[in-house]
């Protein structure tokens, strides 16, 4: 089911939802990466719903099926506001259900900031190959061009440095999907790219604020994320309930692995045991 939810500033956001047949044991809000969108994670949403969870995944403003201001963001706060407002709306519709915010790739950064800023709405946090410590990025020259554009034309677009589908997966079918996906975000404005840099700074100072149970899922052959630095960051979280799962041989987007049910099942089992 896909519906349009309107943020407080009037921006219409597409939200995919998967509702279990029985009363949900918990709610999961999935947050996708910088290039991806809800279409990449239909399988994960369905599998989590089959495990008994109410699941939602909103296309980030300017990405996926949200065509208004394509590739743009006005500020980091606005992106985190969207998550907080959606969490509030979901709580109003179905009160009393604990929510796990699960951030995937670049979405892991937003998930961390949401958990830090809205602890009363986020019962647990899952980080799936999160992009806090990336191995890829723009060159110094490109950074300078982006900085100039930020002060002269914030809607000027630049290529996102993730053009090779092999960065995401070694699966030929997954690579073909990414290559031909018309909704993948391949360019971002100076506004979004500077917002991402500011988000990085906020994420760096967030560990002391993360006190919820946290799950970190890592792909052993990740070419986008620096796993060692990500583990170091994870160890600094204030949470006393931290779990790490690593998938040897897996690449960045676990959804494109030969058996995507594995990480979905592990995520579901972890959320379920929190309520035991």
Which residues make up each language-model segment?
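N-terminal cap/lid segment of alpha/beta-hydrolase-fold proteins
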Residues: 1-20
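Catalytic nucleophile-loop/oxyanion-hole region of alpha/beta-hydrolase
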Residues: 35-37, 64-94
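Acidic catalytic loop of the alpha/beta-hydrolase fold
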Residues: 221-225, 253
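Catalytic active-site module of serine/aspartate enzymes centered on a nucleophile-bearing elbow/loop
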Residues: 243-276
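Alpha/beta-hydrolase-fold enzymes
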Residues: 104-189
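Short beta-strand/loop motif that positions the catalytic acidic residue
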Residues: 210, 216-218, 222
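Short alpha-helix in the alpha/beta-hydrolase fold that links the catalytic acid
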Residues: 212, 226-235
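Conserved alpha/beta-hydrolase
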Residues: 45-68
């Amino acid at each position: 089911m896909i519906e349009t939810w309107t943020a407080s500033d009037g921006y219409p956001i597409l939200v995919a939802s998967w509702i279990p047949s029985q009363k949900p044991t918990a709610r999961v809000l999935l947050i996708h990466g910088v290039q991806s969108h809800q279409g990449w994670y239909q399988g994960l949403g369905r599998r989590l719903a089959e495990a008994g969870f109410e699941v939602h995944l909103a296309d980030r403003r300017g990405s996926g099926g949200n065509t208004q201001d394509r590739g743009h963001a006005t500020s980091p706060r606005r992106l985190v506001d969207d998550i907080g407002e959606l969490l509030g709306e979901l709580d109003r519709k179905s009160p009393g259900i604990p929510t796990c915010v699960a951030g995937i790739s670049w979405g892991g950064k937003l998930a961390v900031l949401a958990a830090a800023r809205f602890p009363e709405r986020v019962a647990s946090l899952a980080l799936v190959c999160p992009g806090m410590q990336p191995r890829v990025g723009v060159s110094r020259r490109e950074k300078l061009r982006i900085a100039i554009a930020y002060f002269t034309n914030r809607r000027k677009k630049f290529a996102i440095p993730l053009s090779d589908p092999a960065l995401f997966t070694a699966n030929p079918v997954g690579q073909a999907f990414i290559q031909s996906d018309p909704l993948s975000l391949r360019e971002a404005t100076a506004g979004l790219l500077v917002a991402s840099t500011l988000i990085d700074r906020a994420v760096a100072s967030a560990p002391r604020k993360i006190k919820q149970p946290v799950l970190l899922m890592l792909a052993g052959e990740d070419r986008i994320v620096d796993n060692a630095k990500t583990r170091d960051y994870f160890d600094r979280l204030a949470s006393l309930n931290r779990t790490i799962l690593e998938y040897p041989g897996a690449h960045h987007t676990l959804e494109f692995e030969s058996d995507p049910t594995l990480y979905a099942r592990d995520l579901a089992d972890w959320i379920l045991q929190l309520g035991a």
